Amino acid sequence: MAAKIIKFDQEGRNAILKGVNILADTVKVTLGPKGRNVVIDKSFGAPLITKDGVTVAKEIELEDKFENMGAQLVKEVASKTSDVAGDGTTTATVLAQAIYRQGSKLVAAGHNPMEIKRGIDKAVETIVAELQKISKPIVDHKEIAQVGTISANNDKTIGDIIAEAMEKVGKEGVITVEEAKSMDTTLETVEGMQFDRGYLSPYFVTDPERMEAALENALILIHDKKISNMKDLLPILEQTAKSGRPLLIIAEDIEGEALATLVVNKLRGVLNVAAVKAPGFGDRRKAMLEDIATLTGGLVISEEVGHKLEQATMDMLGRAKRITIDKDNTTIIDGEGKEADIQGRVKQIRAQIEETTSDYDKEKLQERLAKLVGGVAVIKVGAATEVEMKEKKARVEDALHATRAAVDEGVVPGGGVAYIRTLSALDNLNLENEQQFGVTVVKLALEAPIRQIADNAGIDASIVVDKVRNGKDAFGYDAASDEYVDMLKAGIIDPTKVSRSALQNASSIAGLMLTTEALIAEKPREEGAMGGGMPGGMGGMGGMGGMGGMGGMM
């Protein structure tokens, strides 16, 4: 086991503070509308230019192991805030630096760090409650666009596209961000339920020009096993042929004789039929088939529940107004399932989302929910160069998260004003002894975001803070236009969830760092010790000359 170096007390806290400052000072130059860019060197390809706090934070690794601990802990603040709220990473970093910097001064002066931490925690609880009081719900298109615009660094086109996407697919809908092949940023929406399985044979195509199979007023047979034997399918095919309606078969797979017979009957014009594989894998496949059945008012024909394919009847089939199938995707539009059944299924999926701890499972459940109730929108991000495309795509993703957060918990005045407005709540918070110092730390830290926005805009921060403090409600400083305005009317708003998460995560990590009394890191190895013994020992390799005899092996 390698030897360790240990630092105690103030020496350790100073090393952490140095690391915190290096990371925070690099990240905070990006804050606000007049925030600057950071250029990151990449080992391959062009350098990355970004104004995204978490992207900058992730790139920072320091040589000194103790300083690096401080940097990594603040990096955790940024990434945790990004995970929860999707934005506010720079604000969280600025707050963490301010809380730790103020707190470590008090600890150095001999105050009890545990009591200070308790005071910080109580002050943050009070501020979070106050933020929720001044929060304002957002509903209309214009407000959603404003949140998106601000989070995308004041890019109005991105804000408008996100608002349009949310309007089309609803609160539960899935919105994905992809790179476009052109220079324009566009929005594509998919109506109904779409899953990523295309037709099993190109002979099912009804529109050769678009290479698409379109089935109007169709029936849907849903089966959870492979179909390879035609005789199992015959009874239900005869019944659907009599009805004259087109049929879509969704099964684990359709192969051999069964697929060949379907294709032949399709080509002869006896049956208007198409077949696709079931989406997903394992348990998720079963769940998705149930979703399709619920949406279309059919049943999953499964031996697990006592249904055999050869005994299937017309009332087990789902129904939809229109189905389109291309080589990659199947889209079911206007399924004829009962509204009550669909809502019951939605409720069930929502409960699963609440319970699951896995981010991957949560994402997949969210997708299923969207397919049942909302729809799917794709924002295709276009730009002139790849460097710009990557930067723009990161901004769109940030803005999308922030907008979702705003719809969830409402908005507060932006530009650091909300934190200033909540300060008055701390005036009434009287705690015992040294806990009151924790309240003072939070009071000073809450000014840090607005100060940094003013600094980045090249304005005297103290004057800005003073003016905003003396104002009321949403009165604040608009750094983009260098004016004092009503932030809500000017559309300068932050999602409450972002402001709340940034403060909670910053105070949590800063509090832990304050109560740290010892740091342990591995002792760096000396270069000389590593290289000293090697060359001499290698001399014995001369004996390898005998390998010449290996030629005979060939």
UniProtKB/Swiss-Prot annotation:
Keywords: ATP-binding, Chaperone, Cytoplasm, Isomerase, Nucleotide-binding. One of its GO terms (molecular function) is isomerase activity. PROSITE patterns: CHAPERONINS_CPN60. The keyword 4Fe-4S does not apply. Together with its co-chaperonin GroES, plays an essential role in assisting protein folding. The GroEL-GroES system forms a nano-cage that allows encapsulation of the non-native substrate proteins and provides a physical environment optimized to promote and accelerate protein folding. Forms a cylinder of 14 subunits composed of two heptameric rings stacked back-to-back. Interacts with the co-chaperonin GroES. This is Chaperonin GroEL.
